[in-house]
Amino acid sequence: MKSPKVGFVSLGCPKALVDSERILTQLRTEGYQVASDYDGADLVVVNTCGFIESAVQESLDAIGEAMSENGRVIVTGCLGKDEDKIRQMHPNVLKVTGAAAYQDVMEAVHEYVPAPPRHNPFVDLVPEQGIRLTPKHYAYLKISEGCNHRCTFCIIPSMRGDLVSRPVGSVLEEAAALKRAGVKEVLVISQDTSAYGVDTKYKLDFWNGQPVKTKFYDMCEALGQLGIWVRLHYVYPYPHVDAVIDLMAQGKILPYLDIPFQHASPRILKLMKRPAHSENTLDRIKVWREKCPNLVIRSTFVVGFPGETEEDFQILLEWLKEAQLDRVGCFTYSPVEGATANDLPDHVSEEVKQERYERFMQVQQEISAARLQKRIGQTMTVLVDSLEDEYPVAVARSYADAPEIDGNVFVEDIDKSLVQPGQLLEVEITDADEYDLFAKLIQIKTA
């Protein structure tokens, strides 16, 4: 008897990607095969995103394509919170579940495509680290679900609930399993990484027979013992983050912080109801860089938030010039269905939003280009992601570059028979532009 096949479409952020990996791992553990196309699937699971309107539309389109090509579709993920919207467009989907509803998805799969009988998991082995949708050399490590904050532009808590931290022993064991599987870089993700453990009152757990608190610093310290790259994402600048900078300065974890500042005007931050908005971030960034001169800071910002005046925007630009952040993303404000910011007065016109976005990006491009120019002549360690098809070039990243959202280091004139994805290289930086670096190979690192 052939094993049933399940097709899978994964949309959205890295946190949703981890949800997809978990569902796929459970499917494979139970003996289901993963179909490579719609035609070969007994049903299709679509893991959706519902954060902004464009993501909602992409999710609805993906559901429609799966319905058209296959006809038997289970919908999960953040958009699943709005079942009425999904069924209004696609009334014949088999089942709709919410975000991180792993058991609900599996029950729906069991209902419509029963698991194969007499499946022996010891014969059809699933790798210890589970099924991964990322390249073999890096992986996302989700440490918690949900968020306790109620930012006015965000509906994540209504989709994923309040903060629920994973036991630290479970987090560390997963990270160790990833290392054993050959992963060179772990990217720590959640909705609010630096709040990790608050909901458990920093409960004591165990890993390798040693007591470890379910706490941001303690987790980072333990991850730093693994001897692989550890990159922190979605870190809010609470006061206790300062201690983690010491771990970066000691080389225990990558000196890289992804902090979503979102704005710099105190008035706009108050309207956004941002956590930690009262902290003097410029002074703290200065102290962080004194402690750890190699620190790279990435952030995201929103321009055109309801009520944003030209004065507020100028405060943001001046803050940006002083902060000298390394990596920055910017978005124009987009109303999200269900977000309380929609009810704020004085919405900014699309024309003004776009004009401010362009001014913002021009300022940041100059900052980014200047900071990257300083890298020329430096020796850096980079991790190879891929090789270019037509040229002897390795597409790599340094500690300063997260996959997909930051720049690359292009290592030129390599021998493709010697350089492979997942290898660490020692390189010399030879050139730079606004976002990327160019380098020549010094040596392939063996450890």
Swiss-Prot record:
Subcellular location: Cytoplasm
Catalytic activity: L-aspartate(89)-[ribosomal protein uS12]-hydrogen + (sulfur carrier)-SH + AH2 + 2 S-adenosyl-L-methionine = 3-methylsulfanyl-L-aspartate(89)-[ribosomal protein uS12]-hydrogen + (sulfur carrier)-H + 5'-deoxyadenosine + L-methionine + A + S-adenosyl-L-homocysteine + 2 H(+)
Presence of keyword Iron: yes
EC number(s) on file: 2.8.4.4
Signal peptide: none
Ranges where the Radical SAM core domain occurs: 133-370
Cofactor note: Binds 2 [4Fe-4S] clusters. One cluster is coordinated with 3 cysteines and an exchangeable S-adenosyl-L-methionine.
Classification via InterPro entries: Elp3/MiaA/NifB-like_rSAM (IPR006638), Methylthiotransferase (IPR005839), Methylthiotransferase_CS (IPR020612), Methylthiotransferase_N (IPR013848), Methylthiotransferase_N_sf (IPR038135), NA-bd_OB-fold (IPR012340), Ribosomal_uS12_MeSTrfase_RimO (IPR005840), rSAM (IPR007197)
Limits of the TRAM domain: 373-443
Cofactor(s) the protein requires to work: [4Fe-4S] cluster
PANTHER family: RIBOSOMAL PROTEIN S12 METHYLTHIOTRANSFERASE RIMO, RIBOSOMAL PROTEIN US12 METHYLTHIOTRANSFERASE RIMO
Single GO term (MF): 4 iron, 4 sulfur cluster binding
Keywords for this protein: 4Fe-4S, Cytoplasm, Iron, Iron-sulfur, Metal-binding, S-adenosyl-L-methionine, Transferase
Entry superkingdom: Bacteria
UniProt protein name: Ribosomal protein uS12 methylthiotransferase RimO
UniProt source species: Acinetobacter baylyi (strain ATCC 33305 / BD413 / ADP1)
One of the GO BP terms on file: tRNA modification
One GO term describing the cellular component: cytosol
Domain MTTase N-terminal: 4-114
